[in-house]
UniProtKB/Swiss-Prot annotation:
EC number: 7.4.2.8
Official protein name in the record: Protein translocase subunit SecA
Binding site for ATP: Q85, G103, E104, G105, K106, T107, D492
Biological process terms in GO annotation: intracellular protein transmembrane transport; protein import; protein targeting; protein transport by the Sec complex
SUPFAM superfamilies: Helical scaffold and wing domains of SecA, P-loop containing nucleoside triphosphate hydrolases, Pre-protein crosslinking domain of SecA
Main localisation: membrane
Subcellular compartments: Cell membrane; Cytoplasm
Molecular function in Gene Ontology: ATP binding; protein-exporting ATPase activity
Entry-linked NCBIfam families: PRK09200.1, PRK12904.1, secA
InterPro entries tied to this protein: Helicase_ATP-bd, Helicase_C-like, P-loop_NTPase, SecA, SecA_CS, SecA_DEAD, SecA_motor_DEAD, SecA_preprotein_X-link_dom
Biological role: Part of the Sec protein translocase complex. Interacts with the SecYEG preprotein conducting channel. Has a central role in coupling the hydrolysis of ATP to the transfer of proteins into and across the cell membrane, serving as an ATP-driven molecular motor driving the stepwise translocation of polypeptide chains across the membrane.
Organism: Latilactobacillus sakei subsp. sakei (strain 23K) (Lactobacillus sakei subsp. sakei)
Membrane topology listed for this record: Peripheral membrane protein
Subunit note: Monomer and homodimer. Part of the essential Sec protein translocation apparatus which comprises SecA, SecYEG and auxiliary proteins SecDF. Other proteins may also be involved.
Length: 787
């Protein structure tokens, strides 16, 4: 382990040393560019564009372009990037992750690679976690880019397609990760190319890259349509589930958060719903509703996993503590929670398009990111995104004091100690930021502080709209701020007058998160830019992490110490080591899950790419689509004829071929059964294709205007493809949910999913061919065709 860490640090040092030489070149232009007039400095932008057009590369012009962006920032923003920020900028340009501590100026660091890459004219996306940060950075940094002659676009959810198109056509586009993903999906659902908004995905710099590419990696972006209602079944399942007893009727496995009925529970369900066998095929809808109701009632916790506001169930992001507006749990879990909470049950939805962030961001030609905390996930970034994590040195040495964890026997004794600590700091005027893992604990702590007359601000999923304002004041003398994990990422906590003398900002963690990275983010709020600061984590044996993964060694250690007093406090390196070992175990599990998600999602990615590519060819076509439609008809004819001409001619089923032809291709007068008799299979295929060719020619005559024929073909293909594709997405979802339950003995579920998924995809393509054949051959021509 020690050798691994040593090589890790040395490889970073080597990389930083290499980039330091490039930074020297950037800094060598400092005096020359500071003497240029504004006009001369601004004239560098068209000069660089010309040089790129004449064959120079972005790497060739990097030192000069970075130096121009740096001098421009000094003149326009009053900020001059430090040497370490230049190194961070080079890291981003090279498609890697710059790990920069809080307060080291990530936003300013990004201006140099953004400017350089925007010169190529293919678009640069700056990606943030929320619209507040997108708007702020587009406005503030936009001044610099505009001054240097580049256009800046802001892509917000509320914008019209025209406004979005303008934003994407700008040299630099600011957007949230979710809006980028949804725009990509919507672009692949349009029926007219003019409705598309995005350009090809070129270069993205992702701010808070760990939050987007790790924490949200498994979150699928889903565009849904309404499906059929089954409200009554959710209510019945909920009423039944509420009568069950833990252990007797159902069992919960907390480490995996899975729940299942016992034999007794199954018996009760069969009696309650009047069934012989709960797991019969015809009862799958009911078992699905029961599974979701069990999860909703006994695993999903109010004010931790979700909150209820104004009669609506809203998801709480477990990593940021924010309410995820507009997001709903899939597979009926959201409806089951609505039944549990007695609020209106909203209609279930059908997925029409979906993609995960992992697969969306891997489509960029070049991807980079910045964050204060990424080293703990370095392997994942390298394996999944092919990005290295480079730790950028701080501009000034870190002066923060990170104290060892303290452990209490109970939640009550822990919170008692936390309140005592906060109160003493408040009384001497030292600002304190208190991090909690859940909304529930932030509200409990708030009540305890009220009882102790300590004024404070609370920042959690219920009032995140005040986030920037609360965080801005968190460094003032005597300020006490309670925040869930998000702790205002993206907004710096600046120290007020006199606070440095009091020891700077104190950060108190009320429990360890299951991810070390989230703990490090909280620590990083203190001691920015060389300021003093202090951090302390409080834990109890009743904390979630300790309950789920607290080792036997900790329990044995406490027994040996004979600790029974509620206020007893333990501070031991062994405890800290055990906690970190538990965190590493959880991180390993989470990484394996994300990796598995990606392997499953790659099956859908390949299929999605095939469908989207073919769909795009149809939308972009400017000539007739005969080259697309005739092969579809030919494949359908071949399949039907081959199916019914197996073995001896006496066994052939010519009636079935005739039925297909008259229902899907021609009228009964055109083709009698006698015309098929006495012919070989190849001759039958040729005869049917002759009808297809004649039909095509007739339609072309009827639609003498070339555009009308093309429009008719596009209508037919797009309608069929879209309907079959959305059904296929749904079927693949169901396959994925059921594949683990199948009794395949020693078979690998992923291999089964890949093989079955491929078979279903082939089947869907056949269905598309068949439906297109029938619709094209049988459709009556109407004027004013619209897609």
């Amino acid at each position: 382990m020690a050798n691994f860490l040593k090589s890790w640090v040395e490889s970073d040092k080597r990389e930083v040393g290499r980039m330091g030489k490039i930074a020297d070149k950037v800094q060598s232009y400092e005096d020359e560019y500071s003497n240029l007039s504004d006009e001369a400095l601004q004239a560098k932008t068209p000069e660089f564009k010309t040089r790129l057009a004449n064959g120079e590369t972005l790497d060739d012009i990097l030192p000069e372009a970075f130096a121009v962006a740096r001098e421009g920032a000094k003149r326009v923003l009053g900020l001059f990037p430090f040497r370490v920020q230049i190194i961070g900028g080079i890291t981003l340009h090279e498609g890697n992750i710059a790990e920069m501590k809080t307060g080291e100026g990530k936003t300013l660091t990004a201006t140099m690679p953004v400017y350089l890459n925007a010169l190529a004219g293919q678009g640069v996306h700056v990606v943030t976690v929320n619209e507040y940060l997108s708007s702020r950075d587009a406005t503030e940094m936009g001044e610099l880019y505009n001054w240097l002659g580049l256009s800046v676009g802001l892509n917000l959810n509320a914008k019209t397609p025209e406004e979005k198109r303008d934003a994407y056509n700008s040299d630099i586009t600011y957007s949230t990760n979710s809006e980028l993903g949804f725009d990509y999906l919507r672009d692949n659902m349009v029926v007219y190319k003019e409705e598309m908004v995005q350009r090809p995905l070129n270069f993205a710099i992702v701010d808070e890259v760990d939050s987007i590419l790790i924490d949200e990696a498994r979150t699928p972006l889903i565009i849904s349509g309404q499906a059929e209602k089954s409200t009554a079944l959710y209510i019945r399942a909920d009423r039944f589930v509420k009568t069950l007893k833990e252990d007797a009727d159902y069992k919960i496995d907390w480490p995996t958060k899975t729940i299942s009925l016992t034999e007794a529970g199954i018996g009760k369900a069969e009696a309650n719903f009047g069934l012989d066998n709960l797991y019969d095929i015809e009862n799958t809808a009911l078992t699905h509703h029961l599974d979701e109701s069990l999860r909703a009632n006994f695993i999903m916790l109010k004010d931790i996993d979700y909150v209820v506001q104004d009669g609506e169930v809203l998801i709480v992001d477990q990593f940021t503590g924010r309410v995820m507006d507009g997001r709903r749990y899939s597979d009926g879990l959201h409806q089951a929670i609505e039944a549990k909470e007695g609020v209106e049950i909203q209609d279930e939805t059908k997925t029409m398009a979906n993609i995960t962030y992992q697969n969306y961001f891997r489509m960029y030609n070049k991807l980079s990111g910045m964050t204060g905390t990424a080293k703990t996930e370095e392997e994942e970034f390298r394996e999944i995104y092919n990005m290295e994590v480079i730790s950028i040195p701080t501009n000034r040495p870190i002066a923060r004091n990170d104290k060892s964890d303290v452990l209490y026997p109970t939640l009550e004794s822990k919170f008692h100690a936390v309140v005592k600590d906060i109160k003493s700091r408040y009384e001497k005027g030292q600002p304190t930021l208190v991090g909690t893992v859940a909304v529930e604990s932030s509200e409990l702590l708030s009540r305890l502080l009220d009882e102790n007359n300590v004024p404070h601000a609370v920042l959690n999923a219920k009032n995140h709209f005040k986030e920037a304002e609360i965080i801005m004041n968190a460094g003032q003398r005597g300020a006490v701020t309670i925040a869930t994990n998000m702790a205002g990422r993206g907004t710096d906590i600046k120290l007020g007058p006199g606070v440095t003398d009091l020891g700077g900002l104190a950060v108190i963690g009320t429990e360890r998160h299951e991810s070390r990275r989230i703990d490090n983010q909280l620590r990083g709020r203190a001691g920015r830019q060389g300021d003093p600061g202090e951090t302390q984590f409080y834990m109890s044996l009743e904390d979630d992490l300790m309950k789920r993964f607290g080792s036997e060694r900790i329990k044995a250690f406490l027994d040996r110490m004979k600790i029974s007093d509620d206020d007893a406090v333990i501070q031991s390196k062994m405890i800290t080591r055990q906690v970190e070992a538990a965190q590493k175990r959880v991180e390993g599990n989470n990484y394996d899950t994300r990796k598995q998600t990606l392997q499953y999602d790659d099956v859908m990615r390949e299929q999605r790419e095939v469908i989207y590519k073919q769909r795009m060819q149809v939308i972009m076509a400017e000539d007739n689509l005969k080259e697309v439609i005739m092969p579809m008809i030919s494949r359908t004819v071949k399949r039907i004829v081959q199916l019914h001409t197996q073995g001896d001619t006496a066994d052939w089923n010519l009636e079935a071929i005739h039925d297909f032809a008259t229902t899907s291709m021609v009228s009964e007068e055109q083709l009698t059964l006698e015309k098929l008799q006495g012919k070989s299979a190849e001759e039958i295929e040729a005869l049917l294709m002759t009808f297809a060719e004649k039909n095509y020619a007739t339609k072309q005559k009827q639609l003498s205007d070339e555009n009308q024929m093309l429009e008719f073909e596009k209508v037919v293909i797009l309608r069929v493809v879209d309907e079959r594709w959305t059904d296929h997405i749904d079927a693949m979802d169901q396959l994925r949910n059921s594949i683990g339950l199948r009794g395949y003995g020693q078979m690998n579920p992923l291999v089964e999913y890949q093989e079955e998924g491929y078979r279903m995809f082939e089947e869907m393509i056949s269905d598309i061919d068949y439906d297109t054949t029938r619709l094209f051959m049988k459709a009556e021509i109407r004027q004013n065709i619209r897609r």
